[in-house]
Amino acid sequence: VRRAIWYALRNYKEDEQVSIFLQRIIENDKKYYSVSDAFRSLVIVDSSAAKKKVDSLLNRDSHTDVIRKAAISYFGIVMNDENYNKLKNLSAYGGTTWDARPEAINQLGKYANNKTETIDLFIEFLSDNTRSVRRNAVRQIGRYGEKKHLDALDELLAEDPILERNIRYAKKSILKPSNKMKNDQEKEIEELTKKLDNIRKLVN
């Protein structure tokens, strides 16, 4: 219930009282997921306040690294060259924890349209030692890649057949970009609908 409330608070952008409230949750709440959701909302409500907390959260351990992943999302929401470089460092081998690195790959994807060199990073990540990193790189190539990247996906399929489903979906998305856009939009609408339903339940 509280997590749905924290999510709803992101609608109060630039509200000082909401910002202060969310900061207190981040500082005092003992529940990892509560802190994670509060920070994600703070990034929307008050990105300046979120910036002051992001470094400490990057060093805060939690179950499945949910807090560190939330901190990494800041660099994909507040988009600038400095944050892009930060994501490149976090996504590199040893840049952050094993569980959190894949999130850095996801956030890098938000820069792919404006920074075309990002797709080259995803191609490099196909050779990473961590399967979750390779999987997320495949997904980003499916979203932003071109036909010339299909060979790299085929090579990975031969080396890591466990990722077959992800690779085939990525290749299909590249070959049929109109369907890719439609599927991404449908998924986003479904997620927003679910979150709105949760908020309505709280209100009622």
Regions found by a protein language model. Give the residues of each.
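Structural detector for internal amphipathic alpha-helices that build alpha-solenoid repeat scaffolds
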Residues: 1-14, 24, 33-47, 66-80, ...
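Alpha-solenoid HEAT/Armadillo-like helical repeat scaffolds in large eukaryotic proteins
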Residues: 21-29, 53-61, 86-94, 121-129, ...
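Short, charged low-complexity linker/loop segments at the C-terminal edge of domains
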Residues: 151-152, 175-185
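Short amphipathic alpha-helical interaction elements located at domain edges
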Residues: 161-162, 166, 199
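Terminal, low-structured helical/coil segments at or just beyond the last alpha-helical repeat
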Residues: 180-204
